[in-house]
Amino acid sequence: LVSMIKKGGATMTGWEDILLIQSSESQNEKNIRSEHFNYDPIPFVWNNTWREGREDMIYKFANLGFRTVMSNSSAFYFDMSDNKDFENYGLDWSGYVDYFDAWAIDPLDIFSNKVLNAKHGIDQNYINKTEKIKPENVKNFLGIQSQLWTETVIDNNVFDELFVPNIIVFAEKALSL
């Protein structure tokens, strides 16, 4: 596989899980394999539900020298519901995500917005225990990516409800980086 990737001039990418230490924690694992292998994969870091201790995973990867893309489930997943209304489409496994979450997040400093921190019960003691991206490693932060998983998209109306407003907010955030 590696020789095919190199021969084709491609770059191996994948969800962050491909570079995590295998353990009973599964997708909640916080320990990263430090080796870059011989194909220098780019992890798309997605699993960062608030208050689960993984909000800073993107910075850990970048500080280890991995080029990374933020695919933040608690801000950039368009299939997350914004509240508990049972008539809303969307899921809630990464919390309730509204437009403000996507707009307010600073991808290079996830805890910089005091309103978001308060909304998610994040205090300074919690923030002090997290990793920050080092200035010399900002170059490893390639950008942000949004997702719309379609388990709950049953027709065009649901697609429009989940996608259209979110993509506008996301585009504003992506263009401002």
Please annotate each region the language model reported.
Residues 2-177:
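Substrate-binding groove of N-acetylhexosamine-processing glycoside hydrolases
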